[in-house]
């Protein structure tokens, strides 16, 4: 790996390890642009982790000939599809920042319970070895989104919770074909939901702070 690229990833890792800033004497400890920047970095990291975990699980447990048919079954249905949230960048651009933050928070909170079982399911893989930290990473992103909501809502009452149903727990019985399919579907939804969250945050950041990285 090139020295410049390695230094960049080390900087990103260092930023991800930093806690969210606290307010001191009524003044924000970090500008809004930095709050958005940190949230985007954390969402990107989680989305990449979810994508890597999904690919590794698929490679390890799902025969290549079965993957296409499984993708088109109810196994791949995600609870997040039942809420009126944008499904892509173009739709997200039609929503307000406050709406996108609410949707992001709902998506993150729907996974806080299920991901606590990831480390019990995936114990013998280098990719899955970080799964016991996914919960902490999600909680950290949740805190960042809530900080942004406090900054942007400015006393406006919050909308009611839309997503009433959360996801099932991951099944630890990997010898069962049904359990494998269930986990495969959950990982697919986890990847999709984190991709949505990352997209929402990037759309908000780009339209508030015009930058070259807006083309994504």
From Swiss-Prot:
Where is this gene product found?
Secreted
Keyword Zinc attached: yes
Pfam families linked to this entry = Hormone_1 (PF00103)
Write out the residues that bind Zn(2+). Answer: 45, 198
| Keyword Thylakoid applies | no
GO cellular-component term (any): extracellular space
Instruction: Write down the PROSITE patterns for this protein, in alphabetical order.
Output: SOMATOTROPIN_1, SOMATOTROPIN_2
Concerning SUPFAM superfamilies, the annotation shows: 4-helical cytokines
According to the record, the signal peptide region is: 1-26
> Where, per the database record, does this protein carry Phosphoserine?
131
GO MF annotations, alphabetized: growth factor activity; growth hormone receptor binding; hormone activity; metal ion binding
InterPro entries in alphabetical order? 4_helix_cytokine-like_core, Somatotropin, Somatotropin/Prolactin, Somatotropin_CS
Record-annotated disulphide pairs: 78-189, 206-214
Q: Which UniProt keywords apply?
A: Disulfide bond, Hormone, Metal-binding, Phosphoprotein, Secreted, Signal, Zinc
Listed under GO biological process in this entry are:
animal organ development; growth hormone receptor signaling pathway; positive regulation of growth; positive regulation of receptor signaling pathway via JAK-STAT; response to nutrient levels
State the protein's purpose: Plays an important role in growth control. Its major role in stimulating body growth is to stimulate the liver and other tissues to secrete IGF1. It stimulates both the differentiation and proliferation of myoblasts. It also stimulates amino acid uptake and protein synthesis in muscle and other tissues.
Similarity comment text for this entry: Belongs to the somatotropin/prolactin family.
Protein name per UniProt: Somatotropin
Q: Organism source for this protein? A: Cavia porcellus
Q: Which gene encodes it?
A: GH1
């Amino acid at each position: 790996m090139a020295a410049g690229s390695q230094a960049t990833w080390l900087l990103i890792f260092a930023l991800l390890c930093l806690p969210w800033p606290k307010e001191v004497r009524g003044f924000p400890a970090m500008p809004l642009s930095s709050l958005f920047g940190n949230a985007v970095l954390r969402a990107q990291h989680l989305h990449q982790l979810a994508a890597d975990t999904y690919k590794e699980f698929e490679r390890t447990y799902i025969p290549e000939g079965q993957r296409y048919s499984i993708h088109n079954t109810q196994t791949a249905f995600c609870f997040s599809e039942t809420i009126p949230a944008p499904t892509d960048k173009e739709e997200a651009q039609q929503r307000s920042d406050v709406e996108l933050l609410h949707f992001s928070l709902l998506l993150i909170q729907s996974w806080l319970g299920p991901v606590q079982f990831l480390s019990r399911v995936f114990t013998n893989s280098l990719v899955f070895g970080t799964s016991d930290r996914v919960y902490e990473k999600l909680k950290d992103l949740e805190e960042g989104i809530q900080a942004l909501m406090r900054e942007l809502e400015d006393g406006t009452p919050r909308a009611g919770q839309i997503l009433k149903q959360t996801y099932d727990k991951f099944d630890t019985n990997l010898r069962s074909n049904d359990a494998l399919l269930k986990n495969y579907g959950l990982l697919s939804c986890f990847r999709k939901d984190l991709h949505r969250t990352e997209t929402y945050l990037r759309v908000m950041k780009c339209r508030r702070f015009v930058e070259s990285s807006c083309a994504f």
